[in-house]
């Protein structure tokens, strides 16, 4: 009997251990079983493309995923091609997309059958500043000088930007309304192309994100005139750039988010896995250095606070586009 009792305790203990292992395994069961398609709804060389191509090898370096992340650019229709592609992958957790404010602007401007609510939100990774840039050989050393020159010659100065009815054009319209001037707005497929147009003097100015122009700036090819925000960029190497208000007396601000979405209808476990993955990404020293080097503002956000942010950002974008005459 004593031996039988001992066996009973042993069997019971084994059952508890095995059950615990099975439960733990079930809670952490989901992970990618094939390469993840990392969709960038913009062209190569732009801020979104740069970020995605930084994140992909970072995930591999720190062994955060059992499968690689393959970056795929789908820039057509100001991001609509990429959004619709991901929307069409319903239930597939092996597709993600890196989104910008065109998540809101593109469907508002084009009527494309897409809304950010059609996808599964994962996380906001960072906020991106905008800066007014000119060619380094431009005679204009300050934003005030440049604005006065543009104001004196309406429809003479070219402002290059990414897409039509997107962030760059919205900011351009903000400037036109604030200062009573008029640019010739020239759209390009991506921020990299926009930056190159300024270097090649095919445009007179841009409002590129810092990450899109920093290489040209450090090489002495372009010049920042003002940060389009209420406060200066509080990062090494960027603090000397005045705000638009400091440079011109007129206050202007616009920040763009960078976020991650999954297709609709993916398993909750997959969504949670990606939330955890990108939280780990943002905790790496490489990520923190990347934010500093590219003048990106740390702003990790998930869950209900992320949904609230997206709703408010959508409303703001709609209001600005209406004021700018981009939508009715």
Walk through the language-model features, giving the residues of each:
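N-terminal (or domain-start) structured segment
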Residues: 28-118, 156, 164, 180-209, ...
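Short, low-complexity disordered leader/linker segments with a strong preference
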Residues: 1-33, 328
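Hinge/capping helix and adjacent helix->loop/strand transition within the periplasmic-binding protein
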Residues: 61, 85-95, 107-193, 244, ...
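Short coil/turn segments
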Residues: 44-45, 101, 135-140, 162-166, ...
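C-terminal lobe and pocket-closing loops
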Residues: 127, 213-283, 312-315
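A ligand-binding cleft/hinge motif common to bilobed small-molecule-binding domains
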Residues: 101-111, 173-178, 205-240
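An extracytoplasmic/periplasmic, membrane-proximal ligand-sensing/linker region
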Residues: 33-35, 181, 218, 268-328
């Amino acid at each position: 009997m004593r031996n039988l009792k001992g066996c009973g305790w042993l069997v019971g203990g084994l059952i508890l251990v095995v059950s615990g292992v099975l439960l733990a395994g079930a809670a952490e069961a989901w992970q990618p079983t094939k390469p993840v398609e990392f969709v960038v709804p913009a062209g190569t060389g732009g801020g979104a493309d740069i970020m995605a191509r930084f994140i992909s090898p970072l995930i591999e370096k720190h062994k955060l995923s059992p499968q690689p992340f393959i970056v795929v650019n789908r820039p057509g229709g100001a991001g609509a091609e990429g959004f619709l592609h991901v929307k069409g992958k319903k239930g597939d957790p092996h597709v993600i997309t890196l989104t910008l404010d065109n998540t809101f602007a593109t469907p508002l401007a084009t009527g494309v059958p897409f809304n950010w609510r059609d996808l599964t939100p994962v996380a906001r990774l960072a906020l991106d500043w905008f800066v007014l840039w000119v060619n380094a050989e431009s005679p204009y050393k300050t934003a005030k000088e440049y604005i006065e020159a543009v104001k004196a010659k309406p429809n003479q100065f070219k402002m290059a930007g990414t897409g039509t009815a997107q962030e760059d054009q919205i900011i351009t319209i903000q400037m036109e309304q604030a200062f009573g001037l008029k640019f010739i707005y020239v759209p390009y497929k991506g921020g990299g192309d926009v930056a190159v147009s300024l270097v090649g003097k095919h445009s007179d100015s841009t409002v590129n994100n810092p990450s899109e122009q920093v290489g040209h700036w450090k090489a002495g090819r372009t010049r920042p005139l003002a940060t389009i925000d209420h406060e200066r960029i509080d990062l090494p190497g960027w603090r000397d750039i005045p705000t638009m208000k400091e440079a011109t007396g007129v206050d202007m601000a616009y920040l763009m988010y960078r976020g991650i979405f999954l297709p609709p209808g993916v398993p909750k476990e997959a969504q949670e896995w990606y939330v955890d993955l990108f939280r780990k990404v943002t905790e790496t020293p490489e990520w923190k250095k990347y934010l500093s080097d590219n003048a990106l503002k740390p702003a990790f956000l998930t869950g209900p606070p992320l949904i609230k942010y997206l709703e408010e950002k959508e409303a703001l974008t709609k209001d600005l586009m209406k004021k700018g005459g981009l939508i009715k």
